[in-house]
Curated annotation (Swiss-Prot):
Involved in the activation of the plasma membrane proton-ATPase (PMA1) by glucose. The keyword Signal applies. Induction: Up-regulated by ethanol. Keywords: Signal. PANTHER family: PHOSPHATASE DCR2-RELATED, PHOSPHATASE DCR2-RELATED-RELATED. GO terms for biological process: proton transmembrane transport. This is Protein SIA1. It comes from the Eukaryota. One of its GO terms (molecular function) is phosphoprotein phosphatase activity. It comes from Saccharomyces cerevisiae (strain ATCC 204508 / S288c) (Baker's yeast).
């Protein structure tokens, strides 16, 4: 009996050994890939831009050394499975998302892996042939995106097209499904047939169009970005969403939006800001230098024709979180709509954002939150400048990453900010006018005097200003008037005794802000003279007023000792804690070169179409 069991055991052991050897042989390609990814260099960078010739959703297993890049086979579309076999693996780079928790933007997950979006960079970046020029992603891999169906419908109407050819796209299945669950690379093994030759199926619901020859004038895709959260809207020129708010069924987290950018020609040009369509004021013609990606390249704004005034909208304190909380999402949508309505009513020439776009550690995706804030300005081609606040930080990103993202946005003056984050925006009117010219219809261009100059400082509250201001000594005595903006209030915002005030002044406690300017500790020597007052320093450039954010329950303007008005921008975020009777508010300034005056007023979300607290910030002696 014992011999009988021993023989049976030896037989089973041989069978098991044969099965193991067979399984290892069949999965040898997958094992090689896994070994390659386990041992690969961890310093390989993620995808931050460049032309691509392939894109896939790939699994990154927990035992891989890193997920920034990995080796995987390339998918080849064909009519038969035999033609798509590719034993050689290529290096794929993951589409970058500058947050530290990788699982937040994984497209799928399993007990042993997370799936991400990967691309293959084209070898020769100078030649766009065989690169991807358009991209569409379906919410379900068994469905075809609407954009693809629309293009197919166009081809159906053409009897001489190749639409009647049946093309099947397959992915090789070298191993069994249970073994691939552990060791496979690909996520999707669909076989999908589509009529037409333009769109190519890449698996996992991804469809691509390629530049097939040198005569194709379409621009290639040069960048991809991922955004987390609801109510995201892509408004940047040359960018387009390829999938909007994709909800990952097996991951209880925020929806994902993926956007793509097309190549732009490398040249500089000018743009004239203003609202689109019938809302745009025809008399406005403001020239601002921007590059091919509409990033501002010069801090100088020049007026042409008869424009004689300059309007600034100050918005501050949004505290966007971009979480999955429904009330938070609704309030953020309402806030963006509020800003949209103000822009439609006022059509400002410049928007200054004085901090707290984010809500510190409560914010998940800082990029989505910032894009929500600036979307109204980008859509309306209105330039803007951002001064960061104390809440503009995130547990998932560094301060440098946040600032770098803002600098690369279109229409922002942050691209020309100093190393410390300060900005000086110069505005030149075509010529200096007086009240007498109000009655003149035609002005002789030969009698023009020097242009009128205005200057707007946008300071970073956390950085020193001494070196920055020294760079603008040559403008002292040449500026007609100007304004300064920053996030924190100055020490002069807490005056003693009686003082003029217009608006709500509810937070009057001692400033707890720990910056030299807010403590009144300023020391600077300019042109041989020593100054200890920041307001006295600003007056050298004829700055007539300062405006800040930070305090949600203050929206007033109060007058300082040297007759300079110190203002608050209110707080724009709907749903923020405020005392009763205080609504989300924005402040506007208008500089009139003819009347030689600066005026200010406010609008709030309760009565957007009405203005209130209209006042003079500066009134000349003409």
């Amino acid at each position: 009996m014992r011999l009988h069991y021993r023989r049976r055991f030896n037989f089973l052991r041989r069978i098991l050994f044969i099965l193991c050897i067979t399984s290892l042989y069949l999965s040898r390609d997958s094992l090689k890939l896994h070994a390659k990814n386990v041992l690969m260099d961890h310093n390989v960078a993620e995808y931050h831009g460049g032309m691509i010739d392939d894109i896939q959703i790939l699994r990154c297993y927990h035992w891989y050394r890193q997920c920034s890049s990995l080796y995987a086979p390339k998918l080849h579309p064909s009519n038969t499975a035999k033609k798509i076999k590719d034993k050689n693996s290529i290096l794929w780079t993951r589409v970058s998302k500058n947050i530290t928790v990788e699982t937040l933007y994984s497209l799928q997950s399993g007990p042993f892996y997370n799936s991400y979006l990967y691309v293959h960079l084209k070898d020769f970046q100078s030649n766009p042939k065989n690169t991807i020029k358009e991209l569409a992603i379906a919410r379900d891999s068994a469905l075809i995106p609407l954009q693809v169906l629309r293009d197919i419908n166009k081809l159906v109407k053409s009897s001489d097209s190749s639409v009647f050819h049946n093309h099947v796209y397959l992915r090789e299945k070298p191993t069994s499904s249970w073994w691939k669950l552990l060791f496979g690379i690909s996520v999707d093994t669909d076989n999908i047939a589509v009529f037409g030759e333009e769109w190519v199926y890449k698996g996992s619901g991804i469809w691509c169009k390629y530049i097939l020859n040198d005569d194709d004038n379409d621009a290639p895709i040069t960048n991809l970005e991922i955004y987390l959260g609801s109510s995201f809207i892509e408004s940047r020129p040359s960018w387009k969403e390829v999938i909007h708010e994709f909800h990952r069924n097996n991951i209880p987290s925020l929806p994902i939006s993926i956007t793509r950018k097309l190549e732009t020609k490398n040249h500089h040009h000018k743009f004239s800001n203003g609202l689109l369509g019938s809302l745009r004021t025809p008399s406005k013609d403001i020239n601002i230098q921007v590059d091919a990606d509409y990033k501002i390249t010069s801090p100088h704004i020049q007026f042409s024709r008869g424009q004689r005034s300059f309007k600034i909208l100050q918005i501050t304190d949004f505290h966007f979180k971009c979480t999955d909380n429904s009330m938070t999402v609704i309030n953020e949508i309402k806030t963006v709509n509020f800003i949209d309505r103000v822009l439609a009513s006022e059509n400002p020439d410049l928007v200054v954002i004085t901090g707290d776009l984010l809500d510190s550690h409560n914010t998940i995706d800082y990029q989505t939150c910032i894009m929500k804030v600036v979307q109204p300005m980008i859509s309306n081609k209105i330039p803007y400048a951002i001064s960061l606040g104390v809440s503009d930080e995130s547990n998932l990103a560094t301060s440098a990453q946040i600032r770098d993202f803002i600098r690369n946005l279109p229409y922002t003056f942050n691209n020309v900010a100093s190393e410390e984050g300060h900005m000086a925006i110069e505005v030149s009117f075509k010529k200096k006018l007086t009240k007498n010219t109000l009655l003149e219809r035609d002005i002789d261009t030969e009698d023009e005097t020097n242009p009128s100059e205005a200057l707007f400082f946008v300071f970073d509250s956390f950085a020193p200003v001494n070196n920055f201001l020294q760079d603008y000594n040559d403008l002292i005595g040449k500026i007609d008037f100007g304004l300064a903006f920053q996030y924190f209030p100055l020490s002069e915002y807490r005056p003693h005794g009686l003082f003029p005030i217009i608006g709500q002044y509810n937070e009057r406690s001692t400033l707890t802000v720990d910056t030299p300017r807010s403590r009144g500790q300023v020391s600077m020597t300019i042109n041989g003279k020593h100054y200890k007052s920041f307001l006295d320093i600003l007056s050298l450039w004829n700055i007539k007023g300062v405006s800040c954010g930070h305090e949600h329950n203050n929206d007033c303007c109060l007058q300082s000792k040297n007759e300079m008005w110190l203002c608050y921008g209110g707080s724009a975020g709907i749903g923020l804690p405020r005392i009763q009777g205080i609504y989300p508010t924005v402040r506007l300034f208008n500089l009139d070169d003819i009347l030689d005056e600066i005026t200010s007023w406010k609008r709030n979300s309760n009565l957007v179409d009405e203005v209130y607290d209209y006042q003079y910030i500066y009134k000349g002696k003409q």
